């Protein structure tokens, strides 16, 4: 049996878990329950990713809050608050690996801003302009069942982002 995590890696993971327990990383109400160490390790192994210290730490931070939307910068800030020694480049690279493996869904906004969604099934989003906030559109509010692909084509996926902003009092 190969040891996958060193003692140092284990301590880092435990610090992240302790930060979550202290409320530094309090999960919001979410449809999917928060994941613990074994859940994250299992997710990584299931998609063929080795559970390295960085992947486990970021996986605990990312999936430990249930279904949510985040950016690499936000996840990096959470890792910093949890005292994880991880660079922003590592966060970007790990999120790319998670996306390629199907663990998160990548959502591009304005061509350069990337969000990551832990809910990978088919669903659409509202984006609040000026507030940098992305959230799910309730399935019953948007019916795309009647959309047909052009002749000779098939629909691979549907990505809808509805941009909204607060109403002005005029």
Predicted regions and their residues:
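Basic amphipathic alpha-helical segments that dock to polyanions
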Residues: 91-101
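Short, Lys/Arg-enriched N-terminal segment that forms or immediately precedes the first helix
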Residues: 35-48
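Pre-recognition alpha-helix immediately N-terminal to the DNA-recognition helix
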Residues: 56-61, 74
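Non-DNA-binding regulatory cores of transcription-related proteins
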Residues: 100-170
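C-terminal regulatory/oligomerization modules of transcriptional regulators
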Residues: 1-38, 139-170
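DNA-recognition alpha helix
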Residues: 71-83
């Amino acid at each position: 049996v190969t040891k996958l995590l060193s003692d140092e890696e284990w301590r880092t993971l435990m610090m992240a878990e302790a930060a979550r327990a202290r409320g530094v990383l309090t999960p919001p109400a979410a449809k999917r329950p928060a994941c613990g160490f074994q859940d994250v390790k299992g997710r990584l192994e299931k998609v063929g990713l080795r559970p390295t210290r960085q992947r486990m730490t970021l996986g605990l931070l990312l999936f430990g809050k249930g279904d949510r939307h985040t950016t690499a910068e936000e996840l990096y800030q959470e890792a910093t608050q949890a005292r994880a020694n991880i660079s922003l480049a590592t966060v970007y690279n790990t999120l790319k690996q998670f996306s390629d493996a199907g663990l998160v869904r990548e959502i591009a906004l304005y061509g350069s801003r990337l969000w990551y969604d832990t809910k990978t099934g088919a669903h659409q989003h509202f984006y609040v302009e000026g507030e940098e906030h992305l959230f799910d559109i309730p399935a019953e509010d948007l019916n795309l069942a009647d959309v047909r692909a052009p002749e000779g084509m098939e629909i691979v996926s549907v990505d809808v982002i509805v941009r909204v902003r607060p109403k002005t009092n005029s």
